[in-house]
């Protein structure tokens, strides 16, 4: 879910002189998924390697570590806790906690409201959470039927509930991501969430930096 840029990340790192393998963590099925992506671009990649004559191809060596339903990963002084969230019918949907020097970032991933967000997001310095913005998508006769709108909303977190979730986690900051739709009434969205959370959320955007 939302990993279409993975191959571009790998090959761009090679273009940027990466000379060591990648380690990729993911749920069951990650090995097969990455293998299929690498195979899909094998001919194009081989041509680049042969013609560009770079000194290393280590960036194309991928170490896959598949994990279970919950657990921890440590990378130097960064501890990452992963836990299942509810994005059914999508299987193997995960949220993450990133802990560093007593600071905590909780990332919801794609999910409808679920207990694990409340459990693992407790007292987060930043809760980065997806949102489906109620009332912004209108029904059409073709690509956006009533059923479509219902089903899309049903496996995401509606804006009408997100403020309550943030309040229950007691997070210090709430940052919104995965904004559906991308065009919306920002003032109205902030008010909807603020009414329950007690604070204004931060509307996320690409390359946004937040001090934790």
Question: Where are the regions a protein language model picked out?
Answer:
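Binuclear metal-dependent hydrolase catalytic cores
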Residues: 1-106, 114-117, 187-211
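Cap/insert and terminal regions of metallo-dependent hydrolase folds
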Residues: 95, 102-104, 113-208
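Active-site glycine-centered loops adjacent to acidic/histidine catalytic or metal-binding residues
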Residues: 110
